[in-house]
Curated annotation (Swiss-Prot):
S-adenosyl-L-methionine binds at S73, D94, N122, A123. Signal peptide: none annotated. Gene3D superfamilies: Vaccinia Virus protein VP39. Its EC number is 2.1.1.163, 2.1.1.201. It comes from Legionella pneumophila subsp. pneumophila (strain Philadelphia 1 / ATCC 33152 / DSM 7513). Methyltransferase required for the conversion of demethylmenaquinol (DMKH2) to menaquinol (MKH2) and the conversion of 2-polyprenyl-6-methoxy-1,4-benzoquinol (DDMQH2) to 2-polyprenyl-3-methyl-6-methoxy-1,4-benzoquinol (DMQH2). The keyword Ligase does not apply. This is Ubiquinone/menaquinone biosynthesis C-methyltransferase UbiE. It catalyses: a 2-demethylmenaquinol + S-adenosyl-L-methionine = a menaquinol + S-adenosyl-L-homocysteine + H(+); a 2-methoxy-6-(all-trans-polyprenyl)benzene-1,4-diol + S-adenosyl-L-methionine = a 5-methoxy-2-methyl-3-(all-trans-polyprenyl)benzene-1,4-diol + S-adenosyl-L-homocysteine + H(+).
Amino acid sequence: MTNQKQTTHFGFKSVDWNEKEKKVAEVFHSVAKNYDRMNDLMSLGIHHLWKRYTIELSHVRPGQSVLDLAGGSGDLTRLLLQKVGDSGQVILADINAAMLHVGRDRLLDEGLFKNIRYVQGNAQCLPFADNSFHCITMGFGLRNVTDKDEALQSMYRVCKPGGKLMVLEFSTPVFPGLKPVYDWYSFNILPKIGKFVANDEASYQYLAESIRMHPDQETLKAMIERVGFEDCHYHNLSGGIVALHIAYKY
């Protein structure tokens, strides 16, 4: 159980453990309406390739049940719906009501409403029965969770035996010379894009800082295996700017 007295990081700041969740909620409430446009601008559209790659490696089949955790505006959910078909189900879960509404409205506007459930829930204490899902995806959400170990334990609990966990997240660049360039872009350009497009420089400053504070590829791999998942491996995408971790519950 989480020690409620300790502190944690919010970007580069040290905050009370209980305060981080509130601050992260404020960030995503602020960015929700511009979330998709900002993702396109910040990544030059490459985030769509990362997400498609993730779903291709999911090997989700018709009839299966999938949890898209921190599903936000629904990018992964849309792709997963094509995989599970009419006999399957995708649950789009997010702790943030504003992001959940954006995802629901966007998918409804695209005519996607069958076999989707929307659930507001905390990754650290998922409101689902044990052994519920064939696959759990989490795209760009884990770094915002206060207690990552507790969240991973919760994911393990609700994953079916034989099921798969897929965590797509910003990570540590591995190409020589890429990290200083990426750092410069993250701290000098991203907040300015946030300021001019979304009138919200502070939230995108947090984004850059949260990426730097997130565990690197090997550390996250060890964290995933520590809660019980096995055969964890990862794929570095765009030189390690993003990593896709895949693990199994046997």
